[in-house]
Every structure is written in C-alpha cells, then in structure tokens.
Amino acid sequence: MKIGIIGAMEPEVVHLVQAIVDPVHTTIAGIEFISGSIAGKDVVVTRSGIGKVAASIATTLLIEKFAATHVINTGSAGGFVDSLAIGDIVISSEVRHHDVDVTAFGYEIGQMAQQPAAFMPDSTLVNAAKSAVAELGEVKAIEGLICTGDSFICDPVRTKVMRENFPTMAACEMEGAAIAQVCHQFNVPFVVIRSLSDNANNDSPVDFDSYIIKAGMHSAMMVIALLQQL
C-alpha cells in the first residue's frame, strides 16, 4: 500500500510534511511531491494548488508516477451543517460536483457526462477515518456529502441554490470531486477528509483567512490518526 495525500494549500499539508520520515523531494510540472513514511505507512504528500484542474494533475501524477494505490484528499472546506463548528471535520460519504450542469442530456445536476452522479469513497479508508475520530479530542467529525466547484462560496444566493440542489450537502470545497473522478477512472480507492474553515456565507473570506491554519492542522491530525488505523 502506498498512500497519496493531496492538499491544495501550504497550511493544508505543512503538518503532514513535517511528519514524514526520510523525506525525498521530487518536482514535476511545478508540483512538489514528498515521499517517505508516516505512522509506518508509505506515503507521498503533495500540495496540488487550488481548483479542479490542479487537483486532477496532481492526482494523476500520484497514481502514474508514484504508484499510489490509495488517495486521501485533505484540507479545508465551507460548512453547510449547523451542528458543526469551524475546525470540525467532514468525512466523505460521497463526493459530487456542484458546478456541473448537463441536465439537458438527461444527467443529474452535478453529474458530469459519462460519469457517475456521485463518487463513492473506499469503505476501508472511511472506516479508518471514523475509528481515528477518538484521537481528535474535542474535534467533532461526521460523514456527509462533500461537493466541489471552482468557486469560493460566500454568496448567500449561490448558497441557497446549492442547498436546493444538494439538500444533504455537509461541506463544499474546490478539489475533492476532481480527485475522486480521477481515482474513479484509475480504479484507485480514495477518501476526502475536510476540516471546516468557514460556513460558506458573507463572513467566509474573513473566516477563511483566520481559520485556515486551524482547519489545516485538524485535517492533518485526522489523516495521521487514519494512517495509524490502517
């Protein structure tokens, strides 16, 4: 088992990089990959950059160049569940695009043509994440739908539409569904684990800048605890 771990931004991967034993650095297409081990597991950690295209490139390289057999996406997200606070965690029960619309051809809202409507995470990784929750102290974690789009969501009008389209959505972010789609194409197991940095509202730009470090630390703690369960 070799586990590829992807975060979009430096605060989302810095704690994981610091935890790597015997790190080896490789740069491809301007993306740095750090190989080594965490909790005795072979890992490759990368900061992909923000958005679906960047995440897709990094995921493909992890699988093709570094032979990742499993992929974990970690980082921050905007929350859509009132019971969760900033810093709490959502473990993907499924992952969908929220900004895709080819319904004119009979697809569901959010479903890319010739792709499943939802990408389902690997049960072993999800169960390991659920078992790891006990290691997080007072940080709350739930399973839920995570939706992805190439926009930072802070507009109440957009938020309202997203809630109508995806009433069970727990969190939104900008990479997870792209990573999940690449993993689906390559038949590689994945899970998305996100810590809330904001609540997808008018305050989100300020909240994100204030809490991205906290969210990154919590999601990294979750990933390390997950690796210890495997």
Curated annotation (Swiss-Prot):
GO terms for biological process: L-methionine salvage from methylthioadenosine; L-methionine salvage from S-adenosylmethionine; nucleoside catabolic process. Keywords: Amino-acid biosynthesis, Hydrolase, Methionine biosynthesis. GO terms for molecular function: adenosylhomocysteine nucleosidase activity; methylthioadenosine nucleosidase activity. Pfam families: PNP_UDP_1. It is an enzyme of class 3 (hydrolase). Its EC number is 3.2.2.9. One of its GO terms (cellular component) is cytosol. Disulfide bonds: none annotated. InterPro entries: MTA_SAH_Nsdase, Nucleoside_phosphorylase_d, Nucleoside_phosphorylase_sf. Catalyzes the irreversible cleavage of the glycosidic bond in both 5'-methylthioadenosine (MTA) and S-adenosylhomocysteine (SAH/AdoHcy) to adenine and the corresponding thioribose, 5'-methylthioribose and S-ribosylhomocysteine, respectively. Also cleaves 5'-deoxyadenosine, a toxic by-product of radical S-adenosylmethionine (SAM) enzymes, into 5-deoxyribose and adenine. HAMAP family: Salvage_MtnN (MF_01684). This is 5'-methylthioadenosine/S-adenosylhomocysteine nucleosidase. It comes from Shewanella frigidimarina (strain NCIMB 400). The gene is mtnN.
